[in-house]
Amino acid sequence: SHAENLVSYVSSLEMKEVCADLTRFVPGRRLDDDGTVLIRFRGGAKGYISASQIAVGRENDISLEIYGTQGSIEWKHSDPNSLLFRSNGEPLKLYRSGGPGEESASRDHRLPAGHPEGFIEAFSEIYRNFFENIRGGAQPTFPSVLDGVRGMRFLEAVVASSEEGSVWKSLEGGV
C-alpha cells in the first residue's frame, strides 16, 4: 500500500483498475517477492508499479517517473534532494531542494541545502503536518484513514488479480 499511496499522492490521480502478476521466487517464502501491477487511472492515464525483493543490488531503491504530454519528471530515493525535469524541446533541468526559488520544496527541510534529509525524519513531518491541521484546520497533507482504506482495497484487488491469472480488477466503488 506504500507504493499505491506514493503514486496517488504525487500524481493526484485516482486508480480505476489494476492487473497484477505476483511471484514467489525464493522457496519457503510465505509472501510474493516480486510483482508488477499495471494501473488504469480515471481520465485515461496509465501506469505501473514494480516491486522486487530479488532485484540484486537494488537495496530498497525507490524511484518515481511521471510522463505527460508536455514533459516528464524523475525522482530517486537514492538522491532524494534532486528532481529531474524533461520538457519537450528543452534541455534537461535539475532541481535541488533548498535551491533558489524552491521555497515550497524547502518548507519541510530543517537542514541547509546540500544536506540530505533522512528517511526517518520524513515521518516527523507527517506528524507535524497532522498536528498543524488539528490546531489550525489547514488542508491536510498527510495520509488519512480513507487513504488507508483505499490502500487496502488496492492490495486486495492486486492479490485477486494475480490469483485469477492477471485479470483486470476494478477499484471502483471505493473510498
Regions found by a protein language model. Give the residues of each.
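Rossmann-like dinucleotide-binding domain that binds NAD(P)(H)
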Residues: 1-59, 146
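Short arginine-rich
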Residues: 154-164
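C-terminal interaction segments
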Residues: 149-152
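A general structural signal for well-ordered alpha-helical segments in protein cores
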Residues: 3-4, 123-128, 155
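Hydrophobic residues in alpha-helical segments
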Residues: 10, 134-135, 161-162
